[in-house]
Amino acid sequence: MTDSPIPAPAPAAKPKRAKAPRKPASHPSYSEMIVAAIRAEKSRGGSSRQSIQKYVKSHYKVGQHADLQIKLSIRRLLAAGVLKQTKGVGASGSYRLAKGDKAKKSPAGRKKKKKAARRSTSPRKAARPRKARSPAKKPKAAARKARKKSRASPKKAKKPKTVKAKSLKTSKVKKAKRSKPRAKSGARKSPKKK
């Protein structure tokens, strides 16, 4: 009798777990619906999340969790740069399409997105020279520091002048003291002459 393990039927169960293909949604993706809602509203200050939700619910057949899905897809569109937030912070506020996205449509939009991605690389290249310009600003800052130091150096030069003035005063005092002993010496000499 051998103790070899008997193969378990578990691997055969895995193919049964395969999910059935999803049913096609009765509406386009939430990001497309949001873009359509913002285009339809055409407000100058941007569209609020509430107005986007109203538009989506009235024009498309969406489920119970549409509000959450709209909120999440707005965040994704903001991160992707498709939308810009004009007012507010986070999920609250107003949104509008970025300038390049107004002409996009769903079938041709993907091709344009690829082109936009290529365009986005070229502004990044342009941003690199800007970074190169910033070191040019640093020498200006160093020059400003040098100017400050040069301004500080005359103050140091002024201090020796004050010391000189003090030395002049002390020398004058010494001269005056010397003159007094001379007078005394003259007085001493005069009695000897008598």
UniProtKB/Swiss-Prot annotation:
Molecular function (GO) terms listed? double-stranded DNA binding; nucleosomal DNA binding; structural constituent of chromatin
In this chain, the stretch annotated as Disordered covers 1-31, 82-194
Which cysteines form disulfides? none
Pro residues bias: where?
1-12
Q: Does the keyword Membrane apply?
A: no
Q: Where is the composition biased (Basic residues)?
A: 14-25, 105-194
What the entry lists under Pfam families is as follows: Linker_histone
Q: Where in the cell is it found?
A: Nucleus; Chromosome
What SUPFAM superfamilies does the record point to?
Winged helix' DNA-binding domain
Q: Where is the H15 domain?
A: 26-99
Q: Which Gene3D superfamilies match?
A: Winged helix-like DNA-binding domain superfamily/Winged helix DNA-binding domain
Where, by tissue, is this protein expressed?
Answer: Erythroid cells.
- Gene Ontology cellular-component terms listed: nucleosome; nucleus
InterPro entries referenced in this protein's UniProt entry, alphabetically: H1/H5 (IPR005819), Histone_H1/H5_H15 (IPR005818), WH-like_DNA-bd_sf (IPR036388), WH_DNA-bd_sf (IPR036390)
> What top-level branch of life does the organism fall under?
Eukaryota
Choose any GO biological process term that the UniProt entry carries and state it: chromosome condensation
Instruction: List keywords of the entry alphabetically.
Output: Chromosome, DNA condensation, DNA-binding, Nucleus
> Which PANTHER family does the annotation name?
HISTONE H1, HISTONE H1.0
* Family label: Belongs to the histone H1/H5 family.
Q: What is this protein called?
A: Histone H5
Q: Name the species this protein comes from.
A: Cairina moschata
